Amino acid sequence: MADSLTEEQVSEYKEAFSLFDKDGDGQITTKELGTVMRSLGQNPSESELQDMINEVDADNNGTIDFPEFLTMMARKMKDTDSEEEIREAFKVFDRDNNGFISAAELRHVMTSIGEKLTDDEVDEMIREADQDGDGRIDYNEFVQLMMQK
């Protein structure tokens, strides 16, 4: 998993890790983890931090070594990539860049990928995703739709 990180990322993570490894023993406490993550531009919630710690801290000794930290950061980066992919997909559908996917935009994209849909089918797709009932799909509704897949 950590193999997917670039040398630059590993170096950046090592630097951040070292800042919080006060005694230089190659371990950081779980309490310090949130501070390390935030220094790297991540913003995990308390429950996300606890989940990450539980996944990584196999011996439950309350500390995380650098290889464990790298594995965890690689996982976090992978999650971020999928968010970016969803954002890019939304832009493909939102042809006029107004922040919404209309029935016409949905029909156009579906037709361009070879999906021949009737107006009723397109309207049904919009209805399924359209949580606020405004007849179009906003970014948050699109994310919800994509996460269900």
Curated annotation (Swiss-Prot):
Q: Which residues carry this modification: N-acetylalanine?
A: A2
Q: Name one GO biological process term.
A: spore germination
Which key words are in the record? Acetylation, Calcium, Metal-binding, Repeat
**One MF annotation (Gene Ontology) recorded for this entry:** calcium ion binding
- Keyword Acetylation tagged: yes
Among InterPro entries, the record links this protein to: CALM/Myosin/TropC-like, EF-hand-dom_pair, EF_Hand_1_Ca_BS, EF_hand_dom
GO terms for CC?
cell tip; central plaque of spindle pole body; cytoplasm; hyphal tip
Q: Does the keyword Metal-binding apply?
A: yes
Q: Where does Ca(2+) 4 bind?
A: D130, D132, D134, R136, E141
Q: Which domain of life is it from?
A: Eukaryota
Q: Which residues bind Ca(2+) 3?
A: D94, D96, N98, E105
Q: Where does Ca(2+) 2 bind?
A: D57, D59, N61, T63, E68
Q: What's a Pfam family this protein contains?
A: EF-hand_7
Q: Which residues bind Ca(2+) 1?
A: D21, D23, D25, Q27, E32
EF-hand domain location:
8-43, 44-79, 81-116, 117-149
Q: What does this protein do?
A: Calmodulin mediates the control of a large number of enzymes, ion channels and other proteins by Ca(2+). Among the enzymes to be stimulated by the calmodulin-Ca(2+) complex are a number of protein kinases and phosphatases.
Q: Any miscellaneous information on file? A: This protein has four functional calcium-binding sites.
Q: What is this protein called?
A: Calmodulin
What species was this sequence derived from? Emericella nidulans (strain FGSC A4 / ATCC 38163 / CBS 112.46 / NRRL 194 / M139) (Aspergillus nidulans)
Give the organism's phylogenetic lineage.
Eukaryota, Fungi, Dikarya, Ascomycota, Pezizomycotina
Identify the coding gene.
Answer: camA
